[in-house]
Amino acid sequence: MRTTMTMDDGVQFGLGAFETIAVERGKGILLSRHLARLGRSAQFLGLGDLAERGLTMERTAEWIGENCPEHSACKILLTQENLMMRLRPNPYGPARYARGFRMDFSAVRRNETSPLTGHKTLNYGDCILEHRAAAAAGMDERIFLNMRGKLAEGTVGSLFLVSGGRIYTPACEIW
């Protein structure tokens, strides 16, 4: 996998997409869903077809199996001219979930009318700044609301409600 980047619109202006995939025992959790979402974003942003760029389910699963430790995270970053995959430790595990997460609400609002809504793009600066501010305030995460005051997402995490054995998350259509 390449470790240098070409200065394209993704690097210069954030017109790229990414996915972060939890890895357990050498397998990407919900890998097909992550790749499908990345593929939709790639098409929307004009980044091309994933398979034509060599990012198939089989090759991605193989790379994860060969390179990812037991409990880790794999980040795929895609721009017009760049495709990179990297590993990092996954800070989330049973002990962290048992402890729970301290959260508060961000004063920054998500713009539900943005064409980028629903895509994990490289336009992520506000998320990182708000996540750092949350940590400085003793929080683990900060929650974004949309312009109408409805739940949107976390700074670096997804929002889930577990009820009756089912998992729910805010749909783009409602925010």
Positions of PLM-derived features:
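Helix-start/capping segments and mature chain N-termini
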Residues: 1-62, 79-175
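Short secondary-structure junctions
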Residues: 65-72
